[in-house]
Design a protein with these regions (language model features):
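Short acidic/glycine-enriched loop/turn segments that link adjacent beta-strands
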Residues: 110, 139-140
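Acidic/glycine-rich beta-solenoid
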Residues: 1-55, 73-77, 90-98
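A motif-centric feature for acidic-aromatic and gly/ser/thr-rich catalytic loops and repeats
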Residues: 48, 52-117, 151-152
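Activation loop
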Residues: 35, 98, 117, 140-143
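Conserved active-site tyrosine of GNAT-family acetyltransferases
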Residues: 39, 60, 80-82, 121-122, ...
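Short strand->helix junction
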Residues: 75, 135-136
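Short, low-complexity export/processing leader segments characterized by acidic and small residues
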Residues: 68-69, 87-89, 119-129, 133, ...
Length: 159
């Protein structure tokens, strides 16, 4: 059985699915907004962005968070620093030019929440708003790291 879908949007390719469930393209995929990200070898730290033939170099801090981006002429096109919870401050350039925030987090441009595969993190409150996938096994379903050094020290001293 072959299924086909046609989109009413202009210049969209026709998608068809064969009897084995494989998607087949009939036409060229539009590449108007194609973005290629290059990562540091063996990590998730972005080091470059390629868009519309233009190459950008990304500089990250010691935590792997992007802090600057330069075009091929060496001009700064994006720059930001972060507060203690990872929220952007003092941003220069288009905010979502680089959507990566804390390592492994991708900022949703509509909600300004950071997505971590299974959860959403709100940098304005410094906590996750989605439950931990391991639920109560982590002892706090929305915790982002150790919040209290004193509680950690007391826990260590007791045991």
């Amino acid at each position: 059985m072959v299924q086909e879908w046609q989109y009413e949007e202009k210049d969209r390719p026709l998608h068809s699915i064969d009897e084995f469930g494989r998607i087949r393209m009939q036409g060229e995929e539009p590449v108007d907004n194609l973005v290629t990200w290059v990562y540091e070898e063996g990590s998730y730290v972005p080091v470059a962005k390629i868009q519309n033939g233009e190459r950008y170099t990304i500089i990250s801090d010691y935590m792997g968070r992007p802090v600057e981006a330069y075009n091929s002429y060496g001009n700064v096109v994006w720059q930001a620093d972060y507060d203690i919870y990872g929220d952007l401050r003092n941003i220069k350039g288009i905010r979502d030019f680089i959507p990566f925030r804390q390592l492994g987090q991708y900022e949703d441009d509509e909600t300004r929440l950071y997505y971590n595969r299974f959860r959403y993190y709100d940098p304005r409150i410094g906590n996750y708003i989605s439950q931990d996938p391991i639920r109560l096994m982590g002892n706090n379903p929305t915790l982002y790291g150790c919040k209290s050094l004193i509680l950690h020290i007391v826990w260590v001293l007791i045991f």
